A protein has these predicted regions:
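Bacterial Sec-dependent N-terminal signal peptides
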Residues: 11-43, 126-127
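Solvent-exposed segments in extracellular or luminal domains encompassing
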Residues: 85-104
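Beta-rich, blade/repeat-based domains predominating
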Residues: 145-168, 206-224, 229, 249-271, ...
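Short loop/turn segments immediately following the C-termini of beta-strands
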Residues: 176-178, 228-230, 275-277, 285, ...
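Short loop/turn segments immediately following beta-strands, especially the blade-tip
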Residues: 193-197, 239, 283-290, 337-363, ...
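Loop/turn-rich, solvent-exposed surfaces of beta-rich toroidal or solenoidal domains
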Residues: 377-433
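Blade-level signature of beta-propeller repeat domains, shared across WD40, Kelch, NHL, RCC1
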Residues: 441-474
Length: 474
């Protein structure tokens, strides 16, 4: 195409090479005209693109870009978590929104060809505990043993199967005190309740090996592993109610917490047991028998006597992230042991600073040992007052109950929602479940029913009953 020796011409925007050759008496000149730089593109997503999470949970943001040299992040709200400033051209980040609401995350990327941006939106719904506070409460039934009148319910868990005396979904409770006695730690019974309002308690087992039972967990065959403080045993009760002591008895130091962990990959099934000497043990299982014993942690601060014991308790396991949570009553803290299945003998030394004050509360601990990096404090103080029990909610948060030992003027019988990903751990406000005498809350359990409702059960020591709260899915 011939063109004038000077001038301009508009052409369509295309990616091509332009060549202009000019001739004269001395020959031709043909300068190279490079194509324009390509515009950046950005792909930016959160799980489900437009997603909803409960307050207290984290969101993973992921992005890729092309033709970009730099990117800048921003959020529509200062409650969106830490997603601001410079980011690489491709990457991902996990953010924990700090309040309910609608949040838009924006990523703007720039390159030599221009700029482009993309957004993703997240709805942060109310926390589960905040919905519990307005939900109705139902009395399931009395926890008093129908034969001996043992009372003062401590341990509480749910049956995973139907076997022997137990039906799947039944509530299994152990009583800390013997009938007609006020002395703490004398109870010797485990009872069951069908999970319907007005249920009557039925006896599962009675034995001196269960004396002072304060926590329990069920194996897949409904065998009951019980922490028997006074007996200094960890008996195993069959679903038919037969009590045995298959585990080494010389290794316990007054068991005070229990959690069962199913086999996962190369990790065999195990029981985790906390003791009143401040240690955490792992009993590796072969069926219902012990194949190995490992003390994975020691050093939690302990003190007190039955009825006012400060020791690690409330053991709760999250199988999705192989994490064991421990309620540290002495320091008013909740501790996480991550990758707990891989923690070896003496792997965590808890530096509890037990002698730094005259008595509880003690400072939140630090950690040393070969697996020290697996241990961290996820919440401390903030209204926790001698916390004792915990359960895992459907979204991965914990519900934690105070034991109210020497509570003074503080509000008694409160539960807290604790997030392992939210800075500081505390989600929303605590909820008071019983307005009566302090120290009503002991065992607590959580599940999800067939309709997707979050169910929370708790032992109310003031009423010697199991209570139920239901929260419908959002």
């Amino acid at each position: 195409m011939r063109v004038p020796d000077c001038g301009c011409r508009a052409i369509p925007f295309i990616t091509t090479t332009l060549l202009v050759a000019c001739g004269g008496g001395g020959g031709y000149s043909a300068p190279y005209m490079p194509p324009p730089a390509a515009m950046p593109t950005v792909t930016f997503t959160a799980p489900g693109q437009s997603t909803t999470v409960n307050f207290g949970r984290a969101v993973k943001l992921t992005w890729t870009s092309t033709n970009a040299t730099s990117c800048t992040a921003s959020t529509s709200s200062n409650t969106g978590g830490t997603f601001t400033g410079s980011e690489p051209a491709s990457g991902s980040v996990t953010v924990a929104p700090t309040a309910p609401g609608n949040i838009t995350y924006t990523l703007a990327c720039m390159g030599t060809g221009g700029s482009a941006s993309a957004t993703t939106s997240v709805t942060v719904a109310d926390s589960i505990l905040s919905m519990l506070s307005v939900a109705g409460m139902t009395t399931i039934g009395s926890t008093i043993d129908p034969v001996s009148a043992d009372y003062n319910p401590y341990g509480l868990t749910l049956a995973p199967a139907t076997a022997g005396l137990i039906t799947q979904g039944d509530l299994v409770v152990c009583n800390f005190n013997a009938g007609m006695q006020t002395q703490q730690g004398t109870g010797t019974t485990v009872i069951g309740l069908h999970p319907t309002a007005g249920a009557m308690p039925y006896r599962i087992a009675q034995s001196a090996d269960l004396q002072g039972c304060n926590a329990l967990t069920l194996l897949p065959d409904d065998s009951i592993s019980a922490a028997a403080y006074t007996a200094n045993e960890n008996p195993l009760v069959t679903a038919a109610g037969v009590v045995g002591t298959p585990f080494s008895t010389d290794v316990f130091a007054h068991p005070w917490g229990e959690a069962y962990v199913a086999a996962n990959g190369t990790n065999p099934a195990a029981l985790y047991v906390s003791n009143v000497d401040g240690s955490i043990d792992r009993i590796t299982l072969d069926g219902d028998t012990q194949s190995a014993f490992t003390q994975i942690a020691s050093g939690f601060c302990t003190s007190g006597t039955p009825g006012a014991i400060f020791a690690p308790s409330g053991l709760t396991y999250d199988a999705s992230i192989d994490t064991l949570y421990i309620v540290d009553t002495s320091s008013n803290s909740v501790i996480a042991f991550t990758s707990v299945s891989g923690i070896g003998s003496g792997g965590i030394v808890v530096n509890g600073q037990c002698s730094s004050v005259s008595g509880p509360p003690t400072p939140a601990p630090t950690f040393s040992g070969s697996s020290a990096t697996s241990a961290r404090v996820i919440a401390t103080g903030g209204g926790l007052f001698t916390p004792l029990s915990a359960a895992l909610l459907s979204d991965g948060d914990l519900i934690v109950a105070n034991a109210d030992i020497n509570i003074g003027s503080q509000t008694p019988n409160q539960v807290f929602e604790i997030s392992p990903v939210l800075p500081g751990g505390f989600v929303g406000q605590p909820v008071q479940l019983d307005s009566g005498a302090p120290g009503a809350l002991f065992g607590i359990a959580a599940t999800v029913d067939s309709q997707g409702n979050q169910i929370v059960y708790f032992n109310d020591d003031n009423a010697n009953a199991v209570m139920k709260i239901t929260v419908a899915p959002q």
